[in-house]
Swiss-Prot record:
The protein's name: Epimerase family protein Rv2216
One Pfam family cited in the UniProt record for this chain: DUF1731
Similarity remark: Belongs to the NAD(P)-dependent epimerase/dehydratase family. SDR39U1 subfamily.
InterPro entries from the UniProt entry: DUF1731, Epimerase_deHydtase, NAD(P)-bd_dom_sf, SDR39U1
Species annotation: Mycobacterium tuberculosis (strain ATCC 25618 / H37Rv)
GO cellular component assignments: peptidoglycan-based cell wall; plasma membrane
GO biological process terms, semicolon-separated: cholesterol catabolic process
GO molecular function, a single term: cholest-4-en-3-one 26-monooxygenase activity
Transmembrane segments: none
Amino acid sequence: MANAVVAIAGSSGLIGSALTAALRAADHTVLRIVRRAPANSEELHWNPESGEFDPHALTDVDAVVNLCGVNIAQRRWSGAFKQSLRDSRITPTEVLSAAVADAGVATLINASAVGYYGNTKDRVVDENDSAGTGFLAQLCVDWETATRPAQQSGARVVLARTGVVLSPAGGMLRRMRPLFSVGLGARLGSGRQYMSWISLEDEVRALQFAIAQPNLSGPVNLTGPAPVTNAEFTTAFGRAVNRPTPLMLPSVAVRAAFGEFADEGLLIGQRAIPSALERAGFQFHHNTIGEALGYATTRPG
């Protein structure tokens, strides 16, 4: 898609800021959808909580990318925080989906997560598999359902089910690196739970690919091609920072430290593979966890 106009909600986050820079470097026009007063003509104002967003602002837009959502690991879970996880995803998606439908925008790329699949244990899953159980799985189901107005309008909707994004600039890796760098990295519980990961570079490339591919729609796993267990990740991360990783944090300690999130996001996992991306011809720059961690630990944060 040459010289496209792309509107992005959530453009200030880890993925959104990297995607904005990559699209502009490729000579696309990026309109940032912001809550504050717009600073220039490349910003569009909205208030998703009140439903305030003028669909006419999207008249000349080729694609909308929605990356809104509070980080699930931002703090210890409570009833109020779990509600904020839902509200920060579902409400903005409803508002944007309706605006896409009203404005006749051709493409909506909407964030989701591999948490959709629940706890897959050793089972390999792809986009053809159904939703799992648990809070995060139901959150993803409701999040994706909120795109229905755009789908019914005839827009091409991509549900970008992202795994753990590996980047030196933020996210899980940046929080964990200080521990691993002094030899305190540890596997969590049994270490047998799977983790679907993707480097930030490939995440951004996959989103650009999804914007440009007219035949790609529906659920698309944005994960590297080789998911690993927590034990394998721990060993690979230690190797990347040249430190041993002999430690294990017992499940009871993980639960004491992280509460409910331990059993939703740390002691269980997804063994998801990117079948839809690979069928469409996408090629990863980082095919293994070693390559992804090498990329993420040798670049400045």
